[in-house]
Amino acid sequence: MGRRRAPGGGSLGRVLIRHQTQRSRSHRHTDSWLHTSELNDGYDWGRLNLQSVTEQSSLEDFLATAELAGTEFVAEKLNIKFVPPEARTGLLSFEESQRIKRLHEENRQFLCIPRRPNWDRKTSPEELKQAEKDNFLKWRRQLVRLEEEQKLILTPFERNLDFWRQLWRVIERSDIVVQIVDARNPLLFRCEDLECYVKEIDAAKENVILINKADLLTAEQRVAWAVHFEKEGVKVIFWSALAETVHLNGDSKDEVNSVAGEANSSESEDSSLDGNEIPHRDLFLLSEESESDDDDSEYEDCQEDEEEDWQTCSEEDSNPEEGQEEGGCDRDQKEHGPEDSEAQSRASPENSQMSNKSHLVSKQELLELFKKLHTGKKVKDGQLTVGLVGYPNVGKSSTINTIMGNKKVSVSATPGHTKHFQTLYVEPGLCLCDCPGLVMPSFVSTKAEMICSGILPIDQMRDHVPPVSLVCQNIPRRVLEATYGINIIKPGEDEDPYRPPTSEELLTAYGCMRGFMTAHGQPDQPRSARYILKDYVRGKLLYCHPPPGKDPVAFQHQHRQLLENKIKGEELRLQPGKTQKAKQVENVVDKTFFHQENVRALTKGVQAVMGYKPGSGLVTAAAASAENVPGKPWKKHGNRNKKEKSRRLYRHLDV
């Protein structure tokens, strides 16, 4: 027997525990000054359903907040605003866009560019610089006041005074001021106040709008824009620097091939060809100080020969009426001589009032149009100066390089690449002046429109959703799928079946197709957005804004043509009786796999399975009998086909 314990001495702990349990179970508590968790002086949490809530929709979050607000619940509930997911696109609704357009038309007269203050020879450089700063500051305050009072959004215009000073100098020294605009949206890049400022400086100066990238427009679209500007009394010229460069390069290659084929004919022909090649070099190296009168005469003869060659081009075939007018006029001038042509130009008043033509002009036609536009007194005697101005990335430098015949001006896809104006002599008496690109103040609905128009750099954008949403709104779903060969997810059953795809749907499909993935295995939407937006700016995804009064959907002839070509291709493919070979795509992985010289099967375990031995392939009867020889079976001498791990054998296939 063990030692007997004192009665009640060891049960004190159990008594305390039992008392605490009974106290917690009892509902009759006496008031106490002790601070315990059982005080009934707070909110009764027991009546609530304590269910964890980690995610709430916007509506549930609002209703929960309104319920917590108590007395303000009714007032807040009356102001409920349902925000659909499409609101994140950053685009305006139809009603908002119409309202903003009306405000733009009402306040368009307040948009202006800064003027250079009046100066004369007595004005010192310091006084002129201070006056320019004062006028520039006043101009900026006027635009800020317009934004604050009218609640309008202006484009992020140029705020560097030095760029505007270069524009002033280009306008002052130019006889013809050419605004280069993008053919896909000419009204966005056109500045009407710039035309007024040119006339304010000198009424003899001429304004011309050069619609670049006009090869992206169809003939019907060019006619519509020509008629629109004709009604407004503005001279326009349709031009494509890229298409003309390709055309000139093709002609030069044909000339080189023809010269190489006729090189062995006679020595006299070789000497004449050498004489014709020298003026072409003078075209590239021409300057005002180094050329003599003899070289000028040779240059003019060469240019006349090139004009005759150009008139035999396919321009007459594409537009016979206009080709007869242009070509016939030039031939008459060549036949009757320069004196008759000058008399004809003085006699006909049509040269001062030119009608807008919708055909694409060539390099020589463009230079001839410049010479015909300005016939009055020039800023510099004996020299016609043509100033090229406009927004960034509309093709000013590309136009100069095409006219000059080689790379005279640096070109970049990034807007604002040209930093300083420069003058270049095309021929004696004709000078081109390139001005840096200026973002002039204009009304805009959203910043996404400026990114899609190429005004703002794509690589510097912060939010990719609004511009991609604008692309989805302008380009139909079927055109996007046909262009990239992707399948965009269809709208749900409770959605509009004809709604445009969202930016997330397009970027997800494009990213999966191109393999643009993030570190977490999701499609890289920002990277895909940069590719799609650059295709939109380049014209691969083509959308052309119509003139005022035209239906934007009916104006997109290229979309219908693309879809018709796709439907015709599918019909030809599905025609019975025509077996077309399936297009075989050469895959490097498949080609390497099926051309292996050593192919073997691997099995698990150490025993041979159906004639196969691990690591050695098929086991023959002779080899099996040789292995069963008496001796030391545990010795495996010369075992070169021992079992190896599969991950070592095929580690070259691991990615």
From Swiss-Prot:
Recorded name of the encoding gene: Lsg1
Skewed-composition ranges (Basic and acidic residues): 328-339
Annotated residues for binding of GTP: 212-215, 390-397, 434-437
GO cellular component: Cajal body; cytosol; endoplasmic reticulum
Positions with biased composition (Basic residues): 16-28, 633-655
Class of this enzyme: hydrolase
Organism, as annotated: Rattus norvegicus
Protein name: Large subunit GTPase 1 homolog
UniProt family annotation: Belongs to the TRAFAC class YlqF/YawG GTPase family. LSG1 subfamily.
Region Disordered, annotated ranges: 1-31, 253-359, 625-655
